[in-house]
Regions:
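A structural signal for multi-pass alpha-helical bundles of membrane permease subunits
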Residues: 1-192
Length: 192
């Protein structure tokens, strides 16, 4: 979970060292007889390299969410499945996945929004290059407003981006409702 609480600038700097031509990743590749890769210095590899770093940095947060979801599943559901002689796959398919559906949608939406609002990683690692291959929406808004001093355009871009995020949130809320229109809310049985 440590990467989640680390500063994005620190994580980006760490991964710049990992991705450098003399870095640990290219050293490992050389040990397997694979040529050194340009990673963040190649227009084709820069964005996927930053995406891998972002996944590594954020996966602990998603694990905590799913762990909480797994612990919130009523054990009686699994006990009933045991009595019906359900296989492990059937329990997973018919109990675990449906119970985790709202969390899966939440994680998907938050990861998508996080990918769209990525700024620090490409700024620190590549400066938006090479050939603007790591230019993100937020990076473009930032540069339009602070470098080019086009505040009106940057504000408009930010408003459009906010509307897009709101639309994604509405989609999330729509997808997490069941057929009767109720939200998936898990309540633990009260014990007296």
């Amino acid at each position: 979970f440590v990467p989640v609480v680390m500063s994005l600038a620190v994580v980006s700097t760490l991964w710049m060292q990992i991705y450098s031509p003399e870095g640990i990743l290219n050293t490992l590749l050389a040990n397997f007889g694979i040529d050194a890769q340009p990673f963040i210095h190649s227009a084709d590899q820069a964005l996927p390299s930053i995406a891998i770093m972002s996944v590594w940095q954020g996966v602990g947060y998603q694990m905590i969410i799913f762990l909480g979801g797994l612990q919130n599943i009523n054990p009686a559901l699994y006990e009933a499945a045991e009595m019906d002689h359900a296989s492990g796959w059937q329990k997973f398919k018919d109990i675990t996945l449906p119970e985790l559906k709202p969390l899966c949608i939440f994680v998907f939406i938050t990861v998508t929004i996080g990918a769209f609002r990525m700024l620090v990683q490409p700024m620190v690692m590549t400066g938006g290059g090479p050939d603007h291959s790591t230019y993100t929406i937020v990076y473009d808004i930032y540069e339009t407003g602070t470098v080019n001093w086009e505040m009106g355009l940057a504000s408009t871009m930010a408003i459009v981006f906010t509307i897009f995020v709101v639309i994604l949130t509405i989609i999330q809320n729509t997808l997490t409702k069941d057929k009767e229109g109720r939200k998936h809310v898990h309540k633990k049985a009260k014990t007296n």
